[in-house]
């Protein structure tokens, strides 16, 4: 960099720090600037890998959307359970008034420590979320769902009244307020959203999400979750095969997909994922119908291996650690050549 430019930049930085406080602006190469992204695991190893950073990023807004009964709430409850396992505090803003505590407990959520709110209006729900975020004491806030955030004016009006754009304006205003507080408090905020059909679309995708366009822009990660099949035990359906597409990702490459199984009354099948990912990454060896790990046979057929891993959690943990290390090894933010040159010059 030119000497005069360097001096001018130095003076500008000094003025900004004097006016707005130290740390108002910093180089990404500085020790104080966070380059390694702090994440909360999703409960699905395949999805953690697809996200590219090992989980959902803290200090960001995440949108999870999909058709009815596709696993949206299950996925957020898995995230809450993972946050609680590491001592984190989670809040669930239940605008749909449909949270099933029995199912949440089966997934692994500690109900005694879970903060739950069932607000009457959309304004109340978003205000509660904002206060929780600003407190800095909550690690995960889930809003279920955007479609249920009904503006006060709509609730007080008559059935059949037109309230064009009210919800979109509410979301836009709330997200403007929330964004800076979310970053400052390093809180993960998850919005669950529903799908609607655009009328008269002849070409392209007719699907859209509720609540206007603001959430699409403010979200750092957007996940599209769908059922891809049924899991059967004989004639009985015991779960869903689920596919998640990362349609937007500001912290890693987007458009990756993750496939996993959601078992009824149990949540995401961790053992099933470990078998598939272990084979894909050459950590678990498959020969015919037999599976081996570390030179030892661990079962014949996927169902038997799943039972073995449930009975031997230390083996499951070792396979998971090996898969994470291999699949996420390349996730690093390297400084640019120009920044490296500036650091060498001592500026």
Curated annotation (Swiss-Prot):
GO biological process: DNA recombination; DNA repair; SOS response
Stretch forming the signal peptide: none
Subcellular location: Cytoplasm
Superkingdom of source: Bacteria
Chief subcellular location: cytoplasm
Residues given in the record as ATP binding sites: 66-73
Entry GO CC: cytosol
Pfam families: RecA, RecA_C
Protein's recorded name: Protein RecA
The organism of origin for this protein: Methylococcus capsulatus (strain ATCC 33009 / NCIMB 11132 / Bath)
The organism's taxonomic lineage, starting at the top: Bacteria, Pseudomonadati, Pseudomonadota, Gammaproteobacteria, Methylococcales
């Amino acid at each position: 960099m030119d000497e005069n430019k360097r001096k001018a930049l130095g003076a500008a930085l000094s003025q900004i720090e004097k006016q707005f406080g130290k740390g108002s602006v910093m180089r990404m190469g500085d020790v104080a600037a966070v380059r390694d992204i702090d994440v909360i695991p999703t409960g699905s190893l395949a999805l953690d890998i697809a996200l590219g950073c090992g989980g959902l990023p803290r200090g960001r807004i995440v949108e999870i959307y999909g058709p009815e009964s596709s696993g949206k709430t299950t996925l957020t409850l898995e995230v809450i359970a993972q946050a609680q396992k590491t001592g984190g505090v989670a809040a669930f803003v239940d605008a749909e008034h449909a949270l099933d505590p029995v199912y949440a407990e089966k997934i692994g959520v500690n109900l005694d420590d879970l903060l739950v709110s069932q607000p009457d209006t959309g304004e109340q729900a978003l205000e509660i979320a904002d206060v929780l975020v600003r407190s800095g004491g909550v690690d995960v806030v889930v809003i279920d769902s955007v479609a249920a955030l009904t503006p006060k004016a709509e609730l007080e009006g008559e059935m059949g009244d037109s309230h064009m754009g009210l919800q979109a304006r509410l979301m836009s205003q709330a997200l403007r307020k929330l964004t800076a507080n979310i970053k400052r408090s390093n809180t993960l905020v998850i919005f669950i959203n529903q799908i609607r059909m655009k009328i008269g679309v002849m070409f392209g995708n007719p699907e859209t999400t509720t609540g206007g366009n603001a959430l699409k822009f403010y979200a750092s990660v957007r996940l599209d979750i769908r059922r891809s099949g049924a899991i059967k035990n004989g004639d009985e359906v015991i779960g869903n095969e689920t596919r998640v597409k990362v349609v937007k990702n500001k912290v890693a490459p987007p458009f990756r997909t993750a496939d996993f199984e959601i078992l009824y009354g149990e949540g995401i099948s961790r053992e099933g994922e470990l078998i598939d990912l272990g084979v894909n990454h050459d950590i678990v060896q498959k020969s015919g119908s037999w599976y081996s790990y570390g030179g030892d046979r661990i079962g014949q057929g996927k169902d038997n291996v799943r039972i073995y891993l449930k009975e031997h959690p230390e083996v499951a943990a070792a396979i998971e650690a090996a898969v994470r290390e291999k699949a996420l090894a390349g996730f690093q933010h390297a400084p640019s050549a120009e920044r490296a040159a500036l650091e060498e010059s001592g500026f």
